[in-house]
From Swiss-Prot:
Cellular component per GO, a single term: cytoplasm
This protein's name: Methionine aminopeptidase 2-2
EC id: 3.4.11.18
Classification via Pfam families: Peptidase_M24 (PF00557)
MF terms (GO), sorted A to Z: aminopeptidase activity; initiator methionyl aminopeptidase activity; metal ion binding; metalloaminopeptidase activity; metalloexopeptidase activity
Basic residues bias spans: 67-82
Primary role: Cotranslationally removes the N-terminal methionine from nascent proteins. The N-terminal methionine is often cleaved when the second residue in the primary sequence is small and uncharged (Met-Ala-, Cys, Gly, Pro, Ser, Thr, or Val).
Ligand binding (a divalent metal cation 1): D230, D241, E439
Length: 458
C-alpha cells in the first residue's frame, strides 16, 4: 500500500483453527472385514475306523485357526496434509501440519562503502526491534506471506475480463480470511489475523488506493485494462504488504517490466546503514530506462514522484520512513531490525498523482485516544467498533457493511472532522495514462535481508 507524500508527521517520505483432515487410506476400515475362525466341525458318527481321521482333522483345523488368528496389526496411517481448494478456502494450518512455513528469498547485503556504525539512538531503536530474530515471530510472518502467495496465485490464474471488481475484491478478502482461519466477524478476531488494509484494484490512470465499496456502480474489468492488485495480510499486527499488476494485452509488457525491474533494484540496494536516497536513485535509474509503445505512440516510463515505499511497524502500515522513487538528498538510513515495503509505481502520464473523488478507506489515527467524548452517539458507537475490529489498521466501508453496520456515515464524518480517523482517497494520474505497480516486504535482519513475500510469480 503506497504512502502518498508528504506525510502528515514523522519522516517524510493464532490462533490457528484446525479442522478435520481427510485421510483416504483405501480399503475397508479396521474391524469391518475380519476373517472367521478356522475351527473344523466334528461329525456325530463315532465310527472306530474314522477316529484317526477325525483326530487329524481336528489338529489341522486348530493349527489353521491359530495361524489365522496371528494377523499382523495394521499401522495407523500418518495424517496427510490437505490440498488447497479453488478458490482458496482451506486454512494453512491444514496444509502445513508441522506448523512451519516457507522462508522468503534470502539476499546477502551488498558491501557498504561507508559502513558507519550505529549511533546510540540507533542502538536503542534496534533493541525494540530484536523480534526479527525470534523464531515464533518469523514463522507467523512467513505464514502471512504464504497466505498472500496462495491467494494471489489463484487471482492471477482465475481473474479474467468481464468480472466485476466487487467480485474480485471479495474473493481476495474471503481467501485471506479463510486461509488464516479468522473470519473477522467477532470483536477482536480480525486484530489477531486478517487483512492488512483494503484490497486495492486500481485501473489504468488510477495509480493506487481504489477499492470497490457499497453504493458505487460496479466496474467491469476490460481486456484493455491495466490492474494493480495490492493487498495485505497480517498476523498479530505484522503486515505483509505486496502488490502486482495484471494485464491482458502484451502491449503493456514493457511497462510491467520497467516497474518490476525498478522494485528489484530497490530490494537489491536496500540494507542496513544504506541511505534511502541511494535506494531511490537505483529505483529511478532502472525504471526510466524503459519506454512503452501504445497505439503507435511511444511513452517513456516515468517514476511516480509523490507516492513512496515505506517502513512497516506494529499495526501500522506506514511507519514514518518513506522511500521515494526518484533521486533525492535524503540522508536517512535504513536500520537493522526494520521492515520495509519496497514498492514502485511507473506511469505513462505525468508521473504525478492527485486525489480523486470518492473514498478508498479509513484508518484510526496512530495518536488517537482509546476513547473519545463526542456529542453524536453514532460516532461514539462507530469508534468503539473501529477499536474492537481494526485498531489502527486501515479499513473500508465494505468491511463495515460485512459487520452488519448501518447508517454510520454521519458518525464517520464526525470522527474525521475531529481528527481521530483519517480518510484516504483514490490517487490518480492524468486521464488516458497507464500505471503499474510491484511491491515486496523485506526484513532487514542481522546477517541478511529476507524478501518475505517473494514467490515464483514476481
Amino acid at each position: 500500500m503506497g504512502s502518498k507524500t508528504p506525510e502528515r508527521d514523522g519522516h517524510k517520505g493464532q490462533e490457528n483453527t484446525t479442522g478435520p483432515v481427510e485421510c483416504p487410506l483405501g480399503g475397508m476400515p479396521r474391524g469391518m472385514h475380519l476373517a472367521t475362525d478356522g475351527d473344523g466341525t466334528i461329525g456325530d458318527s463315532g465310527d472306530d475306523d474314522d477316529g484317526e481321521a477325525h483326530s487329524t482333522a481336528l489338529i489341522n483345523a486348530n493349527a489353521n485357526g491359530n495361524q489365522k488368528k496371528k494377523r499382523k496389526s495394521k499401522k495407523k496411517g500418518k495424517k496427510k496434509a490437505a490440498k488447497q481448494s479453488s478458490p482458496p478456502r482451506v486454512p494453512l494450518s491444514q496444509l502445513f501440519l508441522q506448523g512451519k512455513y516457507p522462508i522468503g528469498e534470502v539476499q546477502e547485503y551488498q558491501p557498504n562503502v561507508e559502513n558507519t556504525s550505529r549511533t546510540t539512538a540507533e542502538e536503542v531503536r534496534y533493541k525494540s526491534r530484536s523480534h526479527l530474530e525470534d523464531d515464533s515471530f518469523l514463522n507467523d510472518y512467513r505464514k502471512a506471506a504464504e497466505v498472500h502467495r496462495q491467494v494471489r496465485k489463484w487471482t492471477q490464474e482465475r481473474v479474467k475480463p468481464g468480472q466485476g471488481l466487487m467480485e474480485i475484491a471479495e474473493d481476495i478478502d474471503d481467501g485471506v480470511r479463510a486461509l488464516l482461519g479468522h473470519a473477522g466477524l467477532e470483536p477482536g478476531d480480525s486484530l489477531k489475523a486478517g487483512l492488512g488494509f483494503p484490497t486495492g484494484l486500481s485501473l489504468n490512470n488510477v495509480v493506487a488506493h481504489y477499492t470497490p465499496n457499497p453504493g458505487q456502480k460496479d466496474i467491469i474489468l476490460q481486456s484493455s485494462d491495466v490492474m494493480k492488485v495490492d493487498f495485505g495480510v497480517h498476523i498479530n499486527g505484522w503486515i505483509v504488504d505486496s502488490a502486482f499488476t495484471m494485464t491482458f494485452d502484451p502491449v503493456y509488457d514493457n511497462l510491467l517490466a520497467a516497474v518490476k525491474d525498478a522494485t528489484n533494484a530497490g530490494l537489491k540496494t536496500a540494507g542496513i546503514d544504506v541511505r534511502i536516497s541511494d535506494v531511490s536513485a537505483a529505483i529511478q535509474e532502472a525504471m526510466e530506462s524503459y519506454e512503452v509503445e501504445i497505439g503507435g505512440k511511444t511513452f517513456p516510463v516515468k517514476a511516480v514522484r509523490n507516492i513512496t515505499g515505506h517502513n512497516i511497524k506494529h499495526y501500522q502500515i506506514h511507519g514514518g520512513k518513506s522511500v521515494p522513487f526518484v533521486k533525492n538528498s535524503d540522508q536517512t538510513k535504513m536500520e537493522e531490525g526494520e521492515i520495509f515495503a519496497i514498492e514502485t509505481f511507473g506511469s505513462t502520464g505525468r508521473g504525478y498523482i492527485y486525489d480523486d473523488v470518492g473514498v478508498y478507506g479509513y484508518g484510526k489515527s496512530y495518536d488517537a485516544p482509546r476513547q473519545v467524548s463526542l456529542p453524536l452517539a453514532s460516532a461514539r458507537s462507530l469508534y468503539k467498533t473501529i477499536n474492537e475490529n481494526f485498531g489502527t489498521i486501515v479499513f473500508c466501508r465494505r468491511y463495515l457493511d460485512r459487520l452488519g453496520l448501518q447508517r454510520y456515515l454521519a458518525g464517520m464524518n464526525t470522527l474525521v472532522q475531529h481528527g481521530v480517523v483519517d480518510v484516504y482517497a483514490p490517487l490518480v494520474d492524468i486521464k488516458g495514462s497507464y500505471s503499474a505497480q510491484f511491491e515486496h516486504t523485506v526484513l532487514l535482519r542481522e546477517s541478511n535481508k529476507e524478501v518475505i513475500s517473494r514467490g515464483d510469480d514476481y
